[in-house]
A protein has these predicted regions:
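Alpha-helical support elements that line or immediately flank enzyme active sites
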Residues: 5-33, 67-88, 163-208, 212-232, ...
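Short acidic, glycine/serine/threonine-rich loops at helix termini
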Residues: 42-47, 80-83, 178-179, 187-189, ...
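Glycine-rich and small/hydrophobic secondary-structure elements
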Residues: 48-77, 213-265, 322-346, 367-390, ...
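Beta-strand segments within the central parallel beta-sheet cores of soluble alpha/beta enzyme folds
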Residues: 34-35, 200-206, 233-243, 270-275, ...
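Acidic, glycine-rich active-site loops and adjacent beta-strand->loop/helix elements
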Residues: 38, 180-183, 207-211, 240-250, ...
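Glycine-rich loop/linker segments at domain edges
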Residues: 120-164, 254-338, 417-425
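Flexible, low-hydrophobicity surface segments
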Residues: 1-120, 144-147, 415
Length: 453
């Protein structure tokens, strides 16, 4: 069977009623369901169990699914969606970071609050960490700059859409084949949502193709196909359309950034202070981790003795954001690199030279306790500037625009100093048999990087 999901045309609304009667009468339709058939919420992180397989009482974004059907073919399933009658009560929408930051007093919170479990109003997560003495660092600076930056979000856009097939066996076990980067998380979510022992569920991660972080959450369509397979006793497949992939999203957060930095006349950074405001969209996803990542990894390229970052992630009535290549770091890195260029102008230094003078050395520990074993950024800058004739082209342009230098970085194995907690962050089990065979059990799903080999 083939499944399709009916999605909300409204960004924020209460669901007053859903009528499946006519859809079930359509020839070729085998089953239909609403959120009341799978009311238990789920999520990728324990602190953000805020997603429903199908929305139960409220939709929080355009594209939120409210009902699903299974039919003999995709065309019949698609047509049956038109037979479903949904009555909504529209609610005010929160569409910007600024609106998400408004206090309880400034809004009719009973109507605009997207999730009741939020820290305050529509603030999902707040973070504040300081390393060193930020005020002392600014006092030591010869130059201080204070800037405001905004990074537009973007999406992963893998060629291969999300797809899942579920089968309910005669023994009562569920098998799910899904284009997922995180089968263990999907397995855990299914056990919770279906109220089944995990031992009765098997999740098989099929060759994913493109993922880029966009297939690292457990998703609604995976829960829905499993329930429909249980309802019908037949295998059920659901493939998202390209439009639905955009609704699913989990792309890079839009971030509003205030940054203040102090620098000595030789170009060394004495203090760096970030305030980041993330537009998280309608659901938690990896948002708590994303909030930490927008601040924690800005110290691994240049030595910074005093560092402070504060961050807030707000809920808005838009597609949920999550992890995308370089999770959480391109946004503040963009701000920092532009800021360094402005400092280079102040000091009348070449932008490349400013960076080369102050690279974090190998085998060092950053102010926020990240360990940098090797840093090849200097060699990279040399090669790029030479191959591109950076100095000649930058100074030779009559407009002085359209040609610049920016550096990015990411650190592997940085879980603990980014998100401080007592939970285990990774593990591996190795088994060696008597014949010399070695079996490795690890939590890394192979999506092309070679984990299986």
């Amino acid at each position: 069977l083939f499944a399709k999901m009916l999605r909300s045309p409204h960004p924020h609304a209460r669901i007053k009623s859903i009528d499946l009667t006519q859809a079930l009468k359509r020839p070729g339709v085998v089953a239909a369901m609403t959120g009341k058939d799978l009311p238990i919420p789920f999520g990728i992180l324990p602190v953000s169990q805020d997603e429903e397989s199908l929305c139960v009482d409220k939709v929080r974004m355009i594209g939120d699914p409210v009902a699903a059907v299974a039919a003999i073919d995709e065309e019949t399933a698609e047509s049956a969606l038109e037979d479903i009658v949904v009555e909504y009560e529209l609610l005010p929408s929160v569409l910007t970071i600024e609106d998400g930051l408004k206090s309880l007093e400034e809004t009719e919170i009973s109507k605009t609050q997207i999730h009741e479990y939020a820290d305050s109003g529509n603030i999902h997560k707040q973070v504040a960490l300081e390393f060193g003495d930020i005020e002392t660092g600014f006092a030591e600076a010869d130059h201080i700059r204070e800037e405001l930056y905004y990074y537009e979000g973007n999406t992963h856009l893998p060629i291969e859409q999300h797809s899942a097939v579920a089968q309910h066996g005669a023994d009562g076990r569920i098998t799910l084949w899904s284009s997922t980067q995180t089968p263990h998380y999907v397995h855990r979510a299914l056990a919770k949502v279906l109220e089944m022992p995990a031992s009765q569920i098997r999740v098989i991660a099929t060759p994913v193709g493109g993922g880029f972080g966009g297939k690292t959450d457990p998703f609604q369509h995976e829960m829905v196909v499993c329930k429909l397979a249980m309802m019908t006793g037949r295998p059920v497949k659901l493939t998202l359309t390209r439009e639905e992939v955009f609704y699913t999203h989990r792309g890079r957060h839009p971030v509003l950034m205030w940054v203040k930095a102090g620098m000595k006349s030789d170009g060394s950074i004495t203090a760096l202070h970030f305030r980041n405001f993330l537009d998280g969209g309608a659901y938690g996803s990896y948002g708590v981790a994303s909030t930490y990542y927008t601040g924690a990894l800005q110290t691994v390229t240049y030595p910074i003795a005093n560092y402070k970052f504060e961050a807030m992630r707000v809920f808005t009535n838009k597609a949920p954001c999550g992890p995308k290549r370089g999770h959480g770091t391109p946004q503040p890195r963009f701000a920092l690199e532009v800021l360094l260029d402005k400092f280079a102008e102040d000091l009348e230094l070449d932008p490349a030279e400013l960076r080369l003078r102050h690279l974090i050395p190998d085998n060092s520990k950053t102010v926020n306790h990240l360990t940098v074993t090797t840093n090849g950024l200097g060699e990279c800058i040399h090669k790029v500037t030479e191959a591109s004739r950076f100095q000649q082209r930058r100074t030779g342009s009559s407009l002085g625009k359209g040609f610049g230098l920016g550096c990015g970085s990411y650190l592997s194995g940085a879980g603990l100093p980014v998100y401080w907690n007592k939970m285990p962050h990774s593990g591996v089990q190795i088994k060696i048999d008597r014949g010399g065979g070695v079996t490795v059990f690890c939590g890394s799903t192979d999506i092309g990087q070679g984990s299986n080999s």
